[in-house]
């Protein structure tokens, strides 16, 4: 499985992880990148800090950052590039997904062929 973080995304995620990790010591702590049902196009991305992987997680390493991807999200995240933009009008993670057949105008949600769940309107 290939999931790539740009330098900016890796730096931002490592910063989050370090600020979260000061109180606890876990050698398996990392970032979970997942796809969940939701958003206006059916799927939405999720990034969370976790202390340990689940049994079915794929484990990826980029630099000093451990990335976990669950087996259901893996096909939808194959080939994804995650970037972090910090601009005047918008800041946050941006996903470039070759599996997306359509994306929402808000940029936070996507469809992946006929298997996408029904979306809800942007608010």
From Swiss-Prot:
It holds the Pfam family Fe-S_biosyn. InterPro entries: FeS_biogenesis (IPR000361), FeS_cluster_insertion (IPR016092), FeS_cluster_insertion_CS (IPR017870), HesB-like_dom_sf (IPR035903). Keywords: Nitrogen fixation. The keyword Ribosomal protein does not apply. GO terms for molecular function: 2 iron, 2 sulfur cluster binding; 4 iron, 4 sulfur cluster binding; iron ion binding. GO terms for biological process: iron-sulfur cluster assembly; nitrogen fixation. It comes from the Bacteria. Belongs to the HesB/IscA family. NCBIfam families: iron-sulfur cluster assembly accessory protein. May be required for efficient nitrogen fixation. This is Protein HesB, vegetative. It comes from Trichormus variabilis (strain ATCC 29413 / PCC 7937) (Anabaena variabilis). The gene is hesB2.
């Amino acid at each position: 499985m290939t999931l790539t973080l740009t330098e900016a995304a890796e730096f931002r995620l490592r910063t989050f992880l370090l600020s979260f990790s000061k109180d606890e010591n876990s050698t398996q702590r990392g970032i979970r990148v997942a796809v969940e049902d939701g958003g206006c196009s059916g799927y939405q991305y999720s990034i969370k800090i976790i202390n340990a992987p689940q049994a079915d997680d794929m484990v990826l390493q980029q630099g000093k950052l451990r990335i976990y991807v669950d087996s259901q999200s893996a096909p939808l995240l194959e080939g994804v590039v995650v970037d972090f933009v910090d601009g005047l009008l918008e800041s946050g993670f941006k996903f470039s997904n070759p599996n997306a057949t359509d994306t929402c105008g808000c940029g936070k949600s996507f469809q992946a062929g006929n298997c996408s769940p029904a979306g809800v309107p942007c608010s």
